[in-house]
Amino acid sequence: MASRDSANADITPEVLLRAYACGIFPMAESIDDPTLFWVEPELRGIIPLGGFRVASRLARTVRSDVFTVTVNRDFRGVIDGCASPQPGRDDTWINRRIRELYIGLHGIGHCHSVEVWQDDDLVGGLYGVSLGRAFFGESMFHRARDASKVALVHLVARLLAGGYELLDTQFVTEHLRSFGAIEVPRQRYRALLDDALHGVADFGALPVDQPVSGAQALEIIAKN
């Protein structure tokens, strides 16, 4: 279900948080479309944190630490990377207004990024919204093989360490399905969200000022 909003100028980061608490999120038709619309899918994508799967080959890549993974070091770089064309995706829903809103959420501590680096180059990452014990994954990108997958593994480890209960992916793709993503009906999602909003999680339970090793991330996931 989607609905057009006729007063986009009135959407603030605080309004956005209230929308997430109600189970809806904004999108734009394209990067050039100045307007936003609200979305509440009939079937919602989630990754059950206790059922997150890491393929053997990816686990080897994560454990090798061929990439350096950081948190909240370059939020703008990540959202700009997500807004750039990707293989198989020529267009994006991240317009200027979306970018401004989520940078605003980041500024008040409710939106976080995971960056993946190869030497000094940002080669992948993701960003999402944190509210209560729920994390809403917004978008990811990669410029090197497996970079976005490595970001997701590190995100899940951080969510598990921080006491999160819900990882919302909005929709399910085959890529996400390989990690254990499923679709749940709207009413079931609302119940999961309501439960996750009661309580507080800690995105900083793992260090945010220094990289976490791949081995440490995989160990946290394996214990859950």
From Swiss-Prot:
Native species: Rhodopseudomonas palustris (strain BisB5)
What is an example of a GO molecular function annotated in this UniProt entry? leucyl-tRNA--protein transferase activity
Q: Which gene encodes it?
A: aat
Q: Name one GO biological process term.
A: protein catabolic process
Output the InterPro entries linked to this UniProt entry: Acyl_CoA_acyltransferase, Leu/Phe-tRNA_Trfase, Leu/Phe-tRNA_Trfase_C, Leu/Phe-tRNA_Trfase_N
The protein's job, in short, is: Functions in the N-end rule pathway of protein degradation where it conjugates Leu, Phe and, less efficiently, Met from aminoacyl-tRNAs to the N-termini of proteins containing an N-terminal arginine or lysine.
Q: What protein does this entry describe?
A: Leucyl/phenylalanyl-tRNA--protein transferase
The record ties this protein, via HAMAP family, to: Leu_Phe_trans
SUPFAM superfamilies the UniProt entry points to: Acyl-CoA N-acyltransferases (Nat)
A cellular component annotation (GO) from this entry: cytoplasm
Q: Which family does it belong to?
A: Belongs to the L/F-transferase family.
EC number, as in UniProt: 2.3.2.6
The catalytic activity, as recorded, is: N-terminal L-lysyl-[protein] + L-leucyl-tRNA(Leu) = N-terminal L-leucyl-L-lysyl-[protein] + tRNA(Leu) + H(+); N-terminal L-arginyl-[protein] + L-leucyl-tRNA(Leu) = N-terminal L-leucyl-L-arginyl-[protein] + tRNA(Leu) + H(+); L-phenylalanyl-tRNA(Phe) + an N-terminal L-alpha-aminoacyl-[protein] = an N-terminal L-phenylalanyl-L-alpha-aminoacyl-[protein] + tRNA(Phe)
Instruction: Provide this UniProt record's keywords sorted from A to Z.
Output: Acyltransferase, Cytoplasm, Transferase
